Structure formats: structure tokens, C-alpha cells
Amino acid sequence: MERPLTVLQVSLYHPTQGPVAFAHVPQQLQHDASRLLVGRGQNTHLQLQLPQLSRYHLSLEPYLEKGSSLLAFCLKVLTRKSCVWVNGLPLRYLEQVPLGTINRISFSGIQMLVRKEGGASLETFVCYFHLSPSPLIYRPKAQETDE
């Protein structure tokens, strides 16, 4: 019997580049339980067409948490050039953070929303990519008061 796969639903948005930045993004990507590389390099699994990105900008790394039978993921920053924001937390070169069920990630103008749906397979996971026509991350603007 085949075990259901863990699914990452990944939505992508860029305010100025739009679909051009995501021209090489597949609709679906099935991947083994090794790290998934994101960047502008030809050897990345998720290749994004932005000159300010590093060839290897970040990775999504699956792992098995102690006491769990489901894949968990962490995001690791692979670039020295810039900061990657994950759920409001700034990360720099080689820093990593575990991902929850819903994750808001931004880097180099790209907004990425990653939703994890658990599955029983520990050998493989699948990503479904969606291009968003509108922003995925909203930051409230500071309001001035008379106080």
C-alpha cells in the first residue's frame, strides 16, 4: 500500500517581476527526502529568475522530529548577500528555523507562503506551486497618534 505524501502548497508573488521571475517554476515537483534548493542557479530545484538572488539562496530541508512519524521541514539560508524573513524573523547566512503549518517567507522582493499538509511517507514529498497576482504578506503601517 502506498503511503500518502507530505504536501507543500507554495504560493509565490513578486511585486514588479510577476510571472517573469517564475518562468522556470513547475506546477508540481515531487522530491525525495533531501533538501530542496531555491535560487537562480541551474542546479536548483526551484529556479527563480531574479539577478539579486544567489545561485543557492535558501533550502527547505525535511527531517524527522523525535517521537513523530511525519516529515517536518526547516528553512536554511544559503546566501551571504541578504536576509531572509520567516514569519517575521530575520535570518542570515547558515541560520535556520523550523517551519510550522503555515509560513510567510520573504526574500529579495519575493513573497512566499508555504502551507504544509502532513503525509505518512518519509521518503518523498511533493510541492505544488501557485503564482499569486496579489501580495501574500501584509505589514500594517505604523499609525501616528497625538499622544
From Swiss-Prot:
Name the UniProt record assigns to this protein: TRAF-interacting protein with FHA domain-containing protein B
Domain of life: Eukaryota
Function: Inhibits TIFA-mediated TRAF6 activation possibly by inducing a conformational change in TIFA.
InterPro entries: FHA_dom (IPR000253), SMAD_FHA_dom_sf (IPR008984), TIFA (IPR033621)
Organism: Mus musculus
Tissue: Expressed at high levels in spleen and at moderate levels in lung, thymus, and small intestine.
FHA domain location: 36-108
Summary of subunit composition and partner proteins: Interacts with TIFA.
Molecular function GO terms recorded: deubiquitinase activator activity; ribonucleoprotein complex binding
SUPFAM superfamilies: SMAD/FHA domain
One cellular component term from this protein's GO annotations in UniProt: cytosolic large ribosomal subunit
Annotated GO biological process: auditory behavior; cellular response to cAMP; cellular response to Thyroid stimulating hormone; cochlea morphogenesis; craniofacial suture morphogenesis; genitalia morphogenesis; hard palate morphogenesis; hematopoietic progenitor cell differentiation
Pfam families in the record: FHA
Designated gene of the protein: Tifab
